[in-house]
A protein has these predicted regions:
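N-terminal secretory signal peptides that target proteins for export/translocation
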Residues: 1-12
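Periplasmic c-type cytochrome electron-transfer domains
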Residues: 2, 29-504
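Intrinsic structural disorder/low-complexity segments
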Residues: 6, 20-21, 393
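Hydrophobic alpha-helical segments, especially transmembrane helices
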Residues: 12-14, 495
Length: 504
């Protein structure tokens, strides 16, 4: 964020925003550019639609959402057989894996290099991860990872990228992801270090909000230097709720919202990410991950087992995880592949249970649905055109064997498309068709329960935002006008908009 020469908070240049029936407020302009023409926003209330209080349709949980287990309930209508399968998947999701060989052969195979011993350690109570609180060694950052890649170095690299067989070219020594933990007898790869710089920003009414800008580095590299062109991208583990419903949205309904060339000239140009499906051996629509780099829950789960824990699955059968040719001791370490599990560490049956569990983590119902302040916030959300990317609703298609997820009107507030979010949030690291400034629109359902479930309120792909307000103020690029509109609102209206988002 730019600062004034005297180091006072930057005060955005604000033209008049005319809102019928309201006191005139100011609209934040482009950082230091000229003021746009006055904008009129209708104050017409946005009515609540039938069923909107149940964002997951009939699959929305009916269980209590007043405890840390609010994200850990199974989808309503799952049936007795489904409930039993869900509970087995839950046990595997929370299991602490150990290195091989071990007397507990059903739980060994961890690593050799890894970031976490369980799925639950990353997805805190099935919710959102967080950046390390105080850096290593005070915090090992189990729920935040550092992705690594390099630009294509030769024709083979360029071919693989062009044909979508890979999303990135891995760093040659350290692979796709920095692993900060190793099994006994091996060195870990190093540790992520974060430095934050506080940058004050003055809003239209004079309120000053401090945003923290992170800088990432790696300390204690154990296997030699990084490639000189290495690109780093931090990733916090996202919430798990509703992913089966997102997977059930018909592909055509997502594609129809894409507008890569902004043909309608509304300033919003969402794009799909086209990625390789190892399961189907073809290019497919990306849906999951911060840049929509995975096409399905199965492939997202397999990638996490391999990269985060070093465990082999039917889709990623390599037991060495993210080890590279530059790490022979890692490649030659004992593994937990067993005949019982089809020569894998996470056999097909175990893997299917984890996938089913993930697909059926239920969305919680709306809170404070009829609160006047929440409804006022909804009006402002639409007035600022936040819904242009955070698409309120879809109807799911047919899900084979899971009728409770089928034909449901859901309210995830995402379009699952890639959008340019500006230089401030850019990681400058392409992933598939996503460039360094693009991110997939994050679903908003359950956002207001983050503190209860995960014990914090840190948002965005790297957890830099310490509140919903900070997350909004980091928006730029295609979301700049919405961010500027938010910055121009009165304190009461900003609070109302946040109450609406917290109610989803």
């Amino acid at each position: 964020m730019p600062q004034s020469p005297n180091n006072r908070p930057l005060r955005l240049r604000l033209p008049l925003l005319l809102v019928p029936g309201l006191t005139a407020v100011c609209l934040a302009a482009a950082a230091l550019g000229g003021a746009p023409a006055p904008v009129r926003i209708s104050e017409a209330a946005i009515p609540n639609e039938p069923g909107e209080e149940s964002p997951g349709g009939s699959a929305t949980t009916r269980d209590s959402i007043d405890t840390r287990e609010a994200f850990s309930h199974f989808s309503h209508g799952i049936g007795l057989e489904g409930e039993a399968k869900f509970k087995v998947g839950n046990a595997i999701f929370r299991k602490l894996w150990v290195s091989a060989p071990s007397s507990t052969t059903s739980s060994d195979g961890l690593g050799p290099l890894y970031n976490s011993r369980s799925c639950q350690s990353c997805h805190l109570k099935d919710g959102r991860g967080r950046p390390p609180a105080a850096n290593f060694p005070a915090d090992t950052a189990e729920s935040m990872f550092l992705r690594l890649s390099i630009p294509p170095q030769n024709d083979e690299h360029r071919r693989l990228l062009a044909e979508r067989h890979v999303n990135t070219i891995n760093e040659p020594t350290y692979g796709e992801q920095l692993q900060n933990i190793a099994i006994q007898g091996l060195d870990n790869e190093g540790h992520m270090h974060i430095d934050y710089k506080e940058e004050p920003l003055a809003l239209g009414d004079g309120t000053v909000v401090s945003l923290r800008r992170p800088t990432y580095s790696i300390e204690g590299l154990k296997y030699g230097p990084l490639h000189p062109d290495t690109m780093l991208s931090p990733r916090v583990a996202p919430p798990m709720i509703g992913v089966g419903l997102l997977e059930a949205i018909p592909e055509a309904d997502i594609r129809t919202r894409a507008d890569a060339g902004d043909k309608d000239k509304d300033g919003i140009s969402g794009r799909t990410n086209e990625v390789w499906s190892a399961e189907h051996n073809k290019v497919a629509l990306g849906r999951f991950g911060w840049k929509a780099g995975k096409p399905s829950v199965r492939e997202q789960a397999a990638g996490a087992f391999a990269g985060d824990m070093g465990l082999s699955t039917p889709l990623v059968p390599n037991p060495s995880g993210d080890c590279t040719a530059a790490q022979p001791a890692c490649l030659n370490a004992p593994n937990g592949n067993t005949e019982r599990d089809g020569g894998l560490e996470v056999g097909a049956k175990l893997f299917d249970h984890v996938v089913f569990y993930s697909q059926n983590l239920a969305v919680p119902p709306r809170r404070n649905f009829n609160d006047p302040a929440v409804n006022r916030g909804k009006t402002l959300f639409y007035a600022l055109r936040c819904q242009s990317c955070h698409t309120p609703s879809f109807t799911t298609g047919k899900v084979e064997g899971q009728p409770h997820l089928s034909k449901q009107k859901i309210w995830p507030y995402t379009d699952l498309l890639l959008h340019d979010m500006g230089e401030g949030l850019a990681d400058n690291r392409p992933e598939g068709m996503a460039d360094g400034r693009e991110w997939r629109t994050a679903p908003l359902w359950g956002l207001g329960l983050t503190r209860l479930v995960s014990g914090h309120t840190q948002f965005l792909h790297d957890g830099r935002a310490r509140s919903i307000e900070e997350a909004i103020l980091w928006h730029a690029g295609e979301a700049k006008s919405a961010r500027d509109g938010y910055a121009a609102l009165s304190k009461a209206d900003r609070e109302a908009l946040i109450k609406f988002v917290e109610s989803l």
